Amino acid sequence: MINLIPMTVRGAEKLREELEQLKNVKRPRITVQIAEARKHGDLKENAEYHSAREEQSFCEGRIQEIESKLSNSQIIDITKISNDGRVVFGSTVTILNIKNNAVFTYQIVGDDESDFKKNLISINSPMSRGLIGKTVNTIAIIHTPSGNVKYKILKIDYI
């Protein structure tokens, strides 16, 4: 049995948009570049040709990677799943660092969607693992390389 990769609806949409761009814009553009470069003669020393072929290889590899991710993903719509007021995949969590009173808001997403600068954290991150299953006003102890950090869950959104 294949393990499905959890992915938010937004994450799947972004991958589909990228796939469409690669297939309908980039791939045809590269094909034209290769045809143009072939017109320049000897392919052994044709830098434009080799550059276009390399770009084609990267493009085709990315297309295969995205198609594989989408076919092996479990797309989860957070607005349609039961959560019982708990932190679950896809939820947005506002937490308070008990030690320094810093407040953070993160959304728990799939590995491929995570972007710490955008406050999107991977379901497999230590932070997510410590928050999953918790409810508002509970304390989550997050294990970090520099020691354990306590966070109070202030708010959970399912958007």
Curated annotation (Swiss-Prot):
GO terms for biological process: DNA-templated transcription elongation; regulation of DNA-templated transcription elongation. The gene is greA. Pfam families: GreA_GreB (PF01272), GreA_GreB_N (PF03449). GO terms for molecular function: DNA binding; RNA polymerase binding. This is Transcription elongation factor GreA. Residues 7-72 form a coiled coil. The keyword DNA-binding applies. Keywords: Coiled coil, DNA-binding, Transcription, Transcription regulation. Necessary for efficient RNA polymerase transcription elongation past template-encoded arresting sites. The arresting sites in DNA have the property of trapping a certain fraction of elongating RNA polymerases that pass through, resulting in locked ternary complexes. Cleavage of the nascent transcript by cleavage factors such as GreA or GreB allows the resumption of elongation from the new 3'terminus. GreA releases sequences of 2 to 3 nucleotides. InterPro entries: GreA/GreB_C_sf, TF_GreA/GreB_CS, Tscrpt_elong_fac_GreA, Tscrpt_elong_fac_GreA/B, Tscrpt_elong_fac_GreA/B_C, Tscrpt_elong_fac_GreA/B_fam, Tscrpt_elong_fac_GreA/B_N, Tscrpt_elong_fac_GreA/B_N_sf. Belongs to the GreA/GreB family.
